[in-house]
Amino acid sequence: PHSLIGLVLLISCVATWADQYNPRSSFLDTSYSKLILKNESSKTYNLEQRPDGLSQFYLDGAPYENNATRFLAIYHSPNIPLISDGSMAARAPAVVLVHGGGGTAFGEWVKRWNDAGFAAIAIAVEGQTDVIASQSRRGRDRWMNSAFGGPRREGIYDDYTKSTGNEWMFHAVFAAIQANNFLRSQENIDHQQIGIVGISWGGVITATTIGYDHRFAFAIPIYGSGFLSDIPNQYGDSLIRNPEY
């Protein structure tokens, strides 16, 4: 009896260990933790002041297929920072803005948050610029590619057979964390009041990002960003067949 009990306990422990250890999860935890521990962004590339007064530049993304990548960011801080009692503050609260499918880093979105007293950084997470390639194209193909862009989204997690470091969602979350690091490197930002906002696929990225980067003070995922496999539409149909999801 004692041998049987011991065997059952051993099997239980092994099963628990197997459930807890997942190479994919281990890779994500390690990669994101290293980036978060830096707590500062890498250098900016191709910094320029836009005609609308905003700053535009590129930040380092994660390597893609063994090649360095960079992603577009548009940033500006408010003229009058907001704090909770409505008075003027020395440091501004800030927010990372993540677009949805077919979008990009939008300067107008940055301005709206500036008007509310927030510094804001909008990022492009599919290797694109904010320059229109063709008015006749729709979605992601509407925008010109950047020179060092990373992967594009492939359907609804259709790239799950790739190595984790080459999956689009890994790169998108990496970019969001890097944007947080950038904000934390700015002296005029209140590091205790930095949040993240995402719309649609940006909401999915937002919800995923806050599972790894606990430095964010708030997160606002806007519509269509959770329990996708339970939705009776193309998302549910696709994800129910996806073993990794």
Which stretches of residues belong to each language-model region?
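N-terminal cap/lid segment of alpha/beta-hydrolase-fold proteins
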Residues: L35-A90
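Cap/lid segment of the alpha/beta-hydrolase catalytic domain
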Residues: A105-G107, K111-F174, S225-R241
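Boundary at the C-terminal end of the N-terminal hydrophobic targeting segment
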Residues: T16-A18
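Loop/turn elements at helix/coil->beta-strand transitions in domains of secreted/extracellular proteins
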Residues: R91-A94, A116-A119, H191-Q192, H214-F218
